[in-house]
Each structure stands twice: as C-alpha cells, then as structure tokens.
C-alpha cells in the first residue's frame, strides 16, 4: 500500500496486509464474526495469496488461516453482483479447496469461506449471510461440507462487527475505530507497503 492510494480491500486488500503482518487482528475479527472466543490461529499458519484475476477478469485477493482445531478459514473479496459473485465462488471453490487439502480432504476438519462483499448482494440489510455448501467429486464418493459467510460491507452499525467492517472499508486513518488497525495501517504506510 502506498501513501497516496486508498486503503480499501477491493483495491489493495487491507485485510491481507493485516493478516500478513498482524494476524492477531484477523484472528480477533474471526472471533467477532463467528461469535466464538475459542478461535485461535496456528502459529505461522497464515497464507497470503496476492490479488489474482479470475476467469471473468475480476480481481480477487485471499487470506487463509488455519485454526488450532484444523479448521481452514479463507477470506476473499468480491465487488460484483450476486450472480457474478456466485460464479466466482464456484470457480474459487473448485480451483482452491483441493489445493489446501491435497488429495486427502479428511485432513481438513472443517472449512469456512468468508467473502467480504462490497455491496449487500442479497439485499436484506444483515451484517452477514451464512450458507451451508458442499463440494462433491464425481470420480469419488467424497462430499466435503463447509460454510460460506458473505459479509455485507455496507453494514454500518456501531458494534464490534460493524467496527471491523467499517475499518476494512475505510480510507481515512483518522476515521478508523479500532486502535490496532490504525496502528497497523500507520506501520504499513511508514514502510511503504
């Protein structure tokens, strides 16, 4: 992130930079999102995949963390409408999940795919939407079940989740609500990342 560029997750992903340098912030965001204080990331079990282009020429970015109970939590961004979003998630799911688990999906206890949405794609004004999903392999009898959580970045309430969503979307350090994110962004700017 350069000083003159806006710190928005759909341009240069702030949550990826935070995940790389300050994974404890993303760990706390995950606890707030899932309402589960027991969430703990494994040490050095964080993977940042730089912004990439999907088959429909849209940019996405990824942050992957592994919890101590072997849950994989993947964060991606999306600024598209619902239909394009669903198509991208299908592409992402097919191209990435097997890569994390190798040939053995049993090595993953569970998986949560968190999609940070620029708009409220479903239109119900909720902070997030949870869907149960599954991945089936036609050549095997394997069915891998996981959760998809669509986070509504237009959610503007003054609660812990709203504070995180606000700061991930914010391009003004002085307007950020969470001190640890402010400090992280100031650090990123000081090193020119």
Which residues are covered by each model-predicted region?
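Elongated, amphipathic alpha-helical interaction scaffolds
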Residues: 1-193
